[in-house]
Amino acid sequence: MKILLIGGSCSLINNLIVKFKKEGHRVSLLTGERYQKKKYEKVFETYNFTYDSEKLSDIIDSVNPDVTICMGAFDSNYRWKEEHEAVKVSSHLVNILMACTQEKKGKVIYLSSDEVYYGDHEEKLQEESPLSGKGVRASMLIQAESICQNFQKNWGLDLTVLRLDHLYNQPKRPEDVNHIGALMCLEALKTGCITVQENHDFSLLNEKDAVEFIYCIAKEPQKHEI
């Protein structure tokens, strides 16, 4: 398969590059920056263009991807805690999906997260469960999922939204300390104890397992939704 990964450098995107290359697939990369400042694993072709570039359609046409994976919630190009980034996140996603729709090249996978749900839920969450995120980042992701659904239904785009539930990894850089496992370990180092909420249970997803799940969806021929 020909794979196009879209996103800033992070542990997840680099592990995806390693996985797809190991399985014999050709991987190309759209960094979202004019000048590549961050390190990535080696790929077949790297495109240093921003998401609002007029060249997006040309890039997708050149790569001719069987699968395009947008890092979405895990795209390090965005400052997710800042409200003014919301317009950028939405407009960039529209540009990317519009280019994918115009070129009609393969299917698209958008990575979202459990943050689109907030609070405790007595019943198991389903794909159709109403979204109830809280905070700036959650609002951005809910809007992004809405955009994805619009392109699914109204533009006929073969698009899958994958919500990665409490993703965690072993941090190698300070910027990797951004998930609950790492934050709890950091709290323990600073205070000597870990604070937990009583009667609050949730699952954790190891990054390597997430990579395997994403790979399985990528090679699956059927259409998916969320």
Each PLM stretch: what is its role?
Residues 3-23:
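N-terminal Rossmann NAD(P)H-binding glycine-rich loop of SDR-like oxidoreductase domains
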Residues 25-34:
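Conserved glycine-rich Rossmann-like NAD(P)H-binding loop of the short-chain dehydrogenase/reductase
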Residues 40, 78-84, 119-123, 173:
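Conserved catalytic-core motifs of eukaryotic protein kinase domains, centered on the activation segment
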Residues 49-88:
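NAD(P)H-binding glycine-rich loop region in Rossmannoid oxidoreductase-like domains
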Residues 61, 80-94, 98, 105, ...:
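Catalytic Tyr-X3-Lys loop
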Residues 68-70, 94-136:
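Conserved Rossmann-fold NAD(P)-dependent oxidoreductase catalytic core, especially the SDR/UDP-sugar
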Residues 86-87, 129, 133-145, 175-182, ...:
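Short-chain dehydrogenase/reductase
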Residues 149-202, 207-211, 215-216:
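NAD(P)-dependent short-chain dehydrogenase/reductase
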